[in-house]
Amino acid sequence: PQVTKYLLWAPHPDVAATRRVITEKLNAGADEKTWVIESRHRGEVIGLASCRRTAPHSVEVGYCLGRRWWGKGLMSEVLGMLLTALDADREVYRVWATCSVDNERSARLLEHAGFYLEGRLARHAVYPTMGPEPQDSLLYAKILR
């Protein structure tokens, strides 16, 4: 429940649903990429990270990590790698992300990575585990050049 609380999708009801989502991600176009985050020691899947080009020079990043791996600096490392790769793409000027106004850990992660708070988006997104009503989100951005 802690991991899925702030996600924009509901937990998958079964393995078949997870397989469908994985297939969709694998078949996504060039403007959207998703990576599995794997434990170095055990090789088990511990999270996901994604990039989605939302405009010619703008990319949205997203991420989630299993509760057991929180507080170990792993997502900071992953986000750093994504930013390094995006900075190498001379067409990308802006990287952005949103998170629930209640997701303090995600907001701190983004700020630590050099993102700045652009504003609060009123009734921006439905977080399924928080109910059917749209909730406020925070909009963060990092300008690469």
Whereabouts are the PLM-identified features?
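A general structural signal marking secondary-structure boundaries and capping sites
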Residues: 1, 25-29, 90
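Juxtamembrane/interface motifs at transmembrane-helix termini
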Residues: 14-17, 25-28, 39, 66-68
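Conserved GNAT-fold acetyl-CoA-binding loop/helix
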Residues: 2-24, 33
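A short helix-loop-beta-strand connector motif used in the catalytic cores of GNAT acetyltransferases and
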Residues: 24-36, 47
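Acyl-donor (CoA/ACP) binding surface of acyl/acetyltransferases
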Residues: 36-145
